[in-house]
Amino acid sequence: MAPQLLLCLILTFLWSLPEAESNVFLKSKVANRFLQRTKRANSLVEEFKSGNIERECIEERCSKEEAREVFEDDEKTETFWNVYVDGDQCSSNPCHYRGICKDGIGSYTCTCLSGYEGKNCERVLYKSCRVDNGNCWHFCKSVQNDIQCSCAEGYLLGEDGHSCVAGGNFSCGRNIKTRNKREASLPDFVQSHNATLLKKSDNPSPDIRIVNGMDCKLGECPWQAALVDDKKGVFCGGTILSPIYVLTAAHCINETETISVVVGEIDRSRAETGPLLSVDKVYVHKKFVPPKKSQEFYEKFDLVSYDYDIAIIQMKTPIQFSENVVPACLPTADFANQVLMKQDFGIVSGFGGIFERGPNSKTLKVLKVPYVDRHTCMLSSNFPITPTMFCAGYDTLPQDACQGDSGGPHITAYRDTHFITGIVSWGEGCARKGRYGIYTKLSKFIPWIKRIMRQKLPSTESSTGRL
């Protein structure tokens, strides 16, 4: 019986082999349900490590939340995600005129520089000198629908068509000396606690002044000239325009019989003062009416007094330029009116009185004074402010020019170049509350100045003329 049972079991086994073989491999549809690739689980160490962008989002597809865990910063996550999803839309640099591109999902955004607009910053909003000076470093001129930049004498127009590059070591308007961080910078001049305010006078002073300024460092005011005579020493200031021309106030010319010029000095008390430079000729504006120094003048102070207060001194021999002796740049009238005089501050300097009716300073003083709008200027003065004048100074701070500073420079800096914008002319006392310094408005006289500077080289004879 046993052999028969064994045979039966063998036959049953052999009969079942084909069915078993057919079930060893599952159909693909069924197999895929079991053989799907699952995301690799982080190990315990990985869970405590900071995110890794290569592991999370490059080796494997990640979600925005996972990317956020890596960067731990919303802005960085957004920047990465916009590129990760559909590539960098900014790779082709679609933004014109140096616009800044920001990638998005299926799009991008251009942030345009001032003066441009459009999806790609392709539209130019301005080609006008009245908007940011046309982006010109010095002078701007409107030409049809475009602008044209040019530079002050001694400068070359840069390859970008906007910047100005100094053509020499002593190009105009460049001061070599700058204040370090431990020194007060010109914009940070503050009120002196021991300011002396003397008895006020109702008379205008033709000899304006610098009160509570700071010592001008060597090379910081290189365009400063001082007018001196044999008896009074420094009696007025001036501005170097070129090797042979110095700008000053017309009323300074009548102060003395003899005039010499000193340049490059900051301390008159030192024994080794600079040489006295001889004057060849003086040009006084023909419309200037010298004030009568009498009580009758001070009571009336008629309209023409101190109007056209400008003169040019021609030297016998050229001024030698150096790091401490450099001319100020002469602006165009439009540039002075539309750009320079719309700045916050101008810079005045001189050897004038340290307080009202006080002695002149032995050291060159410098002060930054804010421009004052014309309406406020006219309301503040007891005397006429003509179109050839402008105001600058402080309403309440005791800082101003003073006696002996007349004829000196009012300078305005623009893009690190210093331009002459005015001449110290007159004022009602020194640093009085509610009173400002009055300056000759240089933009009114650019053609007159250029006409004189086109004159021939100095002759050997001295003379005084009116033009």
Swiss-Prot record:
Site (described: Cleavage): R209, I210
Regions annotated as coiled coil: none
Catalytic activities: Selective cleavage of Arg-|-Thr and then Arg-|-Ile bonds in prothrombin to form thrombin
Domain Peptidase S1 as annotated: residue spans: 210-454
Keyword DNA damage: no
Subcellular location field: Secreted
Active-site residue numbers: H251, D309, S406
An example Gene Ontology molecular-function term: calcium ion binding
GO BP: any one term: induction of blood coagulation in another organism
GO cellular component terms given for this protein: extracellular region; extracellular space; protein-containing complex
Tissue: Expressed by the venom gland.
Site annotation Not modified: residues: E75, D103
Gene3D superfamilies tied to this protein: Coagulation Factor IX (4.10.740.10), Laminin (2.10.25.10), Trypsin-like serine proteases (2.40.10.10)
Subunit structure: Heterodimer of a light and a heavy chains; disulfide-linked. Is associated with pseutarin-C non-catalytic subunit (AC Q7SZN0) in a non-covalent manner.
Additional remark text: Is classified in the group C of snake venom prothrombin activators, since it does not require the mammalian factor Va for the cleavage of prothrombin as the venom contains its own non-catalytic factor Va-like molecule. In contrast to blood coagulation factors that circulate as inactive zymogen in plasma, venom prothrombin activators are always found in the active form in the venom. Hence, catalytic and non-catalytic subunits are found naturally in venom as stable complexes.
Protein name: Venom prothrombin activator pseutarin-C catalytic subunit
Organism (species): Pseudonaja textilis
